[in-house]
Amino acid sequence: MHKRAIYPGTFDPVTNGHADLIERAAKLFQHVVIGIAANPSKQPRFTLDERVQLLKLVTAHLDNVEVVGFSGLLVDFAKDQQASVLVRGLRAVSDFEYEFQLANMNRRLDPDLESVFLTPSEENSFISSTLVKEVALHGGDVSQFVHPEVSKALLSKG
């Protein structure tokens, strides 16, 4: 059994879809590291520290989940964390092509690192951070898509 898995992402912001996948991963693996990518090329709305804090709030009830920010190659971060599995989410068939390319690239960079794909529950399958930010930016209510603390943080960002 794989003991340690990494669920990487930008999480800008963390959504109920992400939380759903984290819950599922926490049941499958002894320890799950949520790797929050610094990824400055995406121009995140929240700083890395803010994203780490929000994810810690969202996952506080899960004893086997740890939240860590990182920069650089994911395969290097996985090695540093002694993880042998990457958890990735698939919302729709359209996600598969990109995720398939990523999985193959990661496998080339580290043949011992496996990618496992999880799907969120149906009610969370359409949620994306991009859509949540767009709704919030235009003054819409995002409370059904994110944790209450994330909703507050989005409101404070304006």
UniProtKB/Swiss-Prot annotation:
Catalytic activity field: (R)-4'-phosphopantetheine + ATP + H(+) = 3'-dephospho-CoA + diphosphate
Binding site for substrate: 10, 42, 74, 88
SUPFAM superfamilies documented for this protein: Nucleotidylyl transferase
Swiss-Prot/TrEMBL keywords: ATP-binding, Coenzyme A biosynthesis, Cytoplasm, Magnesium, Nucleotide-binding, Nucleotidyltransferase, Transferase
Positions contributing to ATP binding: 10-11, 18, 89-91, 99, 124-130
Compartments reported by the entry: Cytoplasm
Family annotation (InterPro entries): Cyt_trans-like, PPAT, Rossmann-like_a/b/a_fold
Gene Ontology cellular-component terms listed: cytoplasm
Purpose: Reversibly transfers an adenylyl group from ATP to 4'-phosphopantetheine, yielding dephospho-CoA (dPCoA) and pyrophosphate.
Name this protein carries in UniProt: Phosphopantetheine adenylyltransferase
The organism's taxonomic lineage, starting at the top: Bacteria, Pseudomonadati, Pseudomonadota, Gammaproteobacteria, Alteromonadales
Recorded name of the encoding gene: coaD
